[in-house]
Amino acid sequence: MLSHNTMVKQRKQQATAIMKEVHGNDVDGMDLGKKVSIPRDIMLEELSHLSNRGARLFKMRQRRSDKYTFENFQYQSRAQINHSIAMQNGKVDGSNLEGGSQQAPLTPPNTPDPRSPPNPDNIAPGYSGPLKEIPPEKFNTTAVPKYYQSPWEQAISNDPELLEALYPKLFKPEGKAELPDYRSFNRVATPFGGFEKASRMVKFKVPDFELLLLTDPRFMSFVNPLSGRRSFNRTPKGWISENIPIVITTEPTDDTTVPESEDL
């Protein structure tokens, strides 16, 4: 039985190998720390097992992305092999390439030279223009498509009632019938004095009213109706009841003049 530490080391090694396969050798140059690297390694390890649906979907998506990413990988590898063979043959024959000459980049076949002006024949061979040979009247004619008629429709085509039942139509509004002319015995309110007096125009006299001025006290009473109300607020009172005013005398208490007696 393997110990826990060895199992953890093996898992880390598997995760690092998977990371190298996916991202290349750039993983060693960046240390993201334990908080980022360990959960990422565990996640990639779980995705590599194909034991759950998420891992299978991840692999399917990875294959689909690789299909478009590495589409020209075989062509590039073949071009590199051909270029290396040509270089070896040139060295053997003594035809060395000049140092100042620049080689054009590898491009797929049937690709126009970007340095030359664009030619319509090179861009789209066989295209002579916007339908010059076909007259413009051909585009204005509208072709009526042939519709399909089922055997059921063919069988009932001779019977109009069945056709109407097959294709229901909206109901048309029926015409209104003329109402009979009945005599009305409803009672009508008769005006006082008969219809002859009621036909005269009734004159209405506007009653006279007096306009008050703004300085009129009656108008002021209307503006502030609380001004004439009786006040029931309690007023402060002294020690003497019934609101009798207190009269304070200012007579001096010490009399300087001494009255004379009868003996003197």
From Swiss-Prot:
Comp. bias (Pro residues): 106-120
Subcellular location: Cytoplasm, Myofibril, Sarcomere, Z line
A single BP term in Gene Ontology: skeletal muscle tissue development
Modified residues (Phosphoserine): S101, S116
Keywords, alphabetical: Cytoplasm, Methylation, Phosphoprotein
Positions bearing Omega-N-methylarginine: R53
Region (Disordered) location: 90-135
Primary subcellular site in the record, as a coarse category: cytoplasm
An annotated GO cellular component: Z disc
Phosphothreonine: residues carrying this PTM: T107, T111
Pfam families, sorted: Calsarcin
GO molecular function: actin binding; FATZ binding; telethonin binding
Complex formation: Interacts via its C-terminus with spectrin repeats 3 and 4 of ACTN2. Interacts with ACTN1, LDB3, MYOT and PPP3CA.
Family: Belongs to the myozenin family.
Role according to the record: Myozenins may serve as intracellular binding proteins involved in linking Z line proteins such as alpha-actinin, gamma-filamin, TCAP/telethonin, LDB3/ZASP and localizing calcineurin signaling to the sarcomere. Plays an important role in the modulation of calcineurin signaling. May play a role in myofibrillogenesis.
Protein name per Swiss-Prot or TrEMBL: Myozenin-2
Designated gene of the protein: MYOZ2
